[in-house]
Every structure is written in C-alpha cells, then in structure tokens.
Amino acid sequence: MPELRALLTDAGFADVQTYVQSGNVVLSTGVSANRVGGKCEKLIAERFGFEVDVIVRSRDELAEVVRLNPLADVADNPKRYQVSFLDGEPAPEVVEQIAAAAAPSERLVAIGRELYAWHPDGVGRSKMWTKLAGKGLGVRATARNWTTVTTLLEMAGES
C-alpha cells in the first residue's frame, strides 16, 4: 500500500494513511466525498491500470456507523460482523431478498447507506454473504469487518 499512499499524497491529499491490503485509506481533504471518490478512482485506474469502486465516508459518518451498531447485542466476534458501505440506499425489496437468504442465526440490518451483517458461522458459509457480495444490490458497495471499521475510525481521529 505504500504506492497507493504515495499516489494520493502526490495528488494533494493530506495525512494519507492506509490499513491492511484491501484498499482502506484515511486522508484529509477539503473537497466533497463524491469528488474524493471520483478522483481516487481515476488516479488508481491511471496509475495501476485497473478500475475500482471507491466508497467514501467522512470521519463523522464513520463515527455514526460505529455509534449506531444495531447488532451490538448479538455480534460478539468482530471478524464475523461486517458493514457493507454503499454508494446509495438499497431498495427495500433488495434488502428483503438478502435477508431471506440468511441462515436462522444470521442477522441483517439496513440503515441508510450501510448494511450491517452478522455471520456467526463465518462469511464463507453464509448464503446471505453471497447475495451481499454480488452485483444484485443495485448500488456499488464494499464490505469491511467490524475490526477494520473501528480501526479506520481510530485512524481518522488522528488525521
């Protein structure tokens, strides 16, 4: 991720930090989230030769995701608790279809542009995850486990 960090720093973003190898970036900027996402997508495509969907949340938005934590009463393993960050609100019928694929022990809560999903038996065994990871959401999405979500918020507090 040093190359990504350097690319974004050279493009004028400040306080650029990366976390693990899955494209998590925390940075400071004075421009809107939409402009940040579009600029990052363009820079990555030009530099690395592939297209990625960049989903952006401000520090305050990420703090709200953590504060809401609608599955805190059941999600006791942060690696099996995921938040899907969407670029728009999913249609209610899409959320219903995803929830219908859930095992009895799984949970799904949609709040705005986030889907909170609890997979107590692991993501690899989840039919609900197959639906969440597919293209059927009708919006662009990226998912992170709870450990990553809270770590990114901690990092954002430092920038």
Which sequence ranges carry the predicted segments?
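Surface-exposed, charge/polar-rich loops and edge strands
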Residues: M1-S159
